[in-house]
Swiss-Prot record:
Keywords: Ribonucleoprotein, Ribosomal protein
Family recorded in the similarity comment: Belongs to the universal ribosomal protein uL13 family.
Molecular function per GO: mRNA binding; structural constituent of ribosome
Protein name as annotated: Large ribosomal subunit protein uL13
Subunit structure: Part of the 50S ribosomal subunit.
Organism: Sulfurisphaera tokodaii (strain DSM 16993 / JCM 10545 / NBRC 100140 / 7)
NCBIfam families listed in its UniProt record: L13_A_E, PRK06394.1
One record GO biological process: translation
InterPro entries, A to Z: Ribosomal_uL13, Ribosomal_uL13_bac-type, Ribosomal_uL13_CS, Ribosomal_uL13_euk/arc, Ribosomal_uL13_sf
Gene label: rpl13
Function, in words: This protein is one of the early assembly proteins of the 50S ribosomal subunit, although it is not seen to bind rRNA by itself. It is important during the early stages of 50S assembly.
């Protein structure tokens, strides 16, 4: 299985639709690098999206919270990774595929000159309603300050 490098620009891309394409690339055995993760889009009114992501923070357990509670991603990198991880197989091969995913905030110097792909069906132009960026969501959840 040859490992090809695919660089995906997440700017103005709908997170869920982009994640399905990334999961398909990972299943094909390719290495995927996602840049501009903080500029990905989540559709829906801001209040509803934030409420959905922060709902799990209120879950409490009687055991050690570091070991046994539900952990919710707060940074843009982890939000994108978690979304893609949910679309991969839940077995050993899925774990190996997930290791081929790298996510960055902004564009690192080593990937500036690489050809970046965008997914047409994941473009923000499809949306008629409201949306929020992953960076804004992360700031509201307390995980991103830039």
């Amino acid at each position: 299985m040859s490992e090809q490098l695919v660089v995906v620009n997440a700017e103005n891309q709908i997170l869920g639709r982009m994640a399905t394409h990334i999961a398909k690339l990972l299943i094909q055995g390719k290495r995927v690098v996602v840049v501009n993760a903080e500029k990905a889009i989540i559709s829906g009114p801001r209040a509803r999206v934030v409420r959905g992501y922060s709902l799990i923070f209120s879950v409490r357990k009687f055991q050690n919270p570091e070991k046994n509670t539900i952990k919710r991603p707060r940074t843009p990198i982890n939000i994108v990774k978690r979304t893609v991880r949910g679309m991969l197989p839940k077995n050993k091969s899925g774990k190996m595929m997930f290791k081929n995913l790298i996510v960055f905030i902004g564009i690192p110097a080593e990937y500036k000159d690489k050809q970046m792909i965008r997914f047409e069906d994941a473009d923000v132009k499809r949306l008629k309603g409201k949306y929020i960026t992953v960076g804004e969501l992360s700031k509201l959840l307390g995980g991103f300050s830039q």
